[in-house]
Amino acid sequence: MIRFDEVSKRYAGGSEALSRVSFELADGEMSFLTGHSGAGKSTLMKLIILMERASQGQVIVNGTNLNRVSRRQVPAVRRNVGVVFQNHQLLFDRTVYDNVALPLTIAGFSPKEVGRRVRAALSKVGLSDKEKRYPVALSGGE
């Protein structure tokens, strides 16, 4: 069983990923989590497996209030929960721009053409404003 009671998650800097989320999944029940990029899907999953902690509210998994789980108890809780995340295959020491540019550079495109193509691709997927960020600063769906 998984239950969220008025759960919020706010990151350093004030960015709020979740705001007062409440739901319950019974034992054996299946659910699909969908939403736009930055909606908080990955954050919600990270709370369930204790990769992160809620800023407010309660997360209950199999009857255990995760707010009360010590660092030493985290592995035992995780052994009873399975989560599959998206696999990005990104280089974390390079910016979003550099990650998109790398195969074009390897393929021999001119720097001007690389820039044109990278910016067109980022624009198409709504990430133009994120080109100078590193992958760790992106939400799971970005």
Briefly describe each language-model feature range.
Residues 57-65:
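Conserved ABC transporter NBD signature motif
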Residues 34-36:
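The feature captures the beta-strand-to-loop junction immediately N-terminal to the Walker
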Residues 66-82, 108-111, 115:
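ABC ATPase NBD coupling module
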Residues 49:
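Helix-to-loop junction immediately C-terminal to a conserved catalytic motif
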Residues 64-65, 105, 112-130:
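Conserved ABC ATPase "signature" region
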Residues 134-142:
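Conserved ABC ATPase signature
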Residues 93-103:
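Short coil-to-helix segment of the ABC ATPase nucleotide-binding domain corresponding to the Q-loop/switch region
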